[in-house]
Amino acid sequence: MNQSAVLIFCLIFLTLNGTQGIPLSRTIRCTCIKISDQPVNLRSLEKIEMIPASPSCPHVEIIATMKKSGEKRCLNPESKTIKSLVKAISKKRSRRSP
């Protein structure tokens, strides 16, 4: 009985030792859970980040950080107002660059 218990233990150990962890399902992790269509005042913006779609999140994400509160808002990249905001910021940045 002792030899069979040791043999079973060794078989289990060798089986578990060779097994690799493989995720059963892919979880999608986007930064933005809820998006806002509300217009944002350029003067109240501290910064705006644009995160492109990736394997971990299929959506383009635009995150605005407000100056006074430091609040981060996820903006709808498909909204006309947000598209024009991004365009205005890009234009402003291109004027600064030599």
Swiss-Prot record:
Q: Which CDD domains match?
A: Chemokine_CXC
According to its UniProt record, which protein family does this protein belong to? Belongs to the intercrine alpha (chemokine CxC) family.
Signal peptide: which range, if any?
1-21
Q: What is the protein's known function? A: Pro-inflammatory cytokine that is involved in a wide variety of processes such as chemotaxis, differentiation, and activation of peripheral immune cells, regulation of cell growth, apoptosis and modulation of angiostatic effects. Plays thereby an important role during viral infections by stimulating the activation and migration of immune cells to the infected sites.
Tell me the residues on which Citrulline occurs: R26
Q: Which GO terms describe its molecular function?
A: chemoattractant activity; chemokine activity; CXCR chemokine receptor binding; CXCR3 chemokine receptor binding; heparin binding
An example of a Gene Ontology cellular component annotation for this protein is: external side of plasma membrane
What does the UniProt entry say about where the protein is found? Secreted
Its subunit composition reads: Monomer, dimer, and tetramer. Interacts with CXCR3 (via N-terminus).
The alphabetical list of record keywords is: Chemotaxis, Citrullination, Cytokine, Disulfide bond, Inflammatory response, Secreted, Signal
SS bond partners: C30-C57, C32-C74
PANTHER family noted in UniProt:
C-X-C MOTIF CHEMOKINE 10, SMALL INDUCIBLE CYTOKINE A
One biological process GO term for this chain?
Answer: chemotaxis
Primary site of residence: secreted
The family database entries (SUPFAM superfamilies) matched by this protein are listed as: Interleukin 8-like chemokines
The protein's name: C-X-C motif chemokine 10
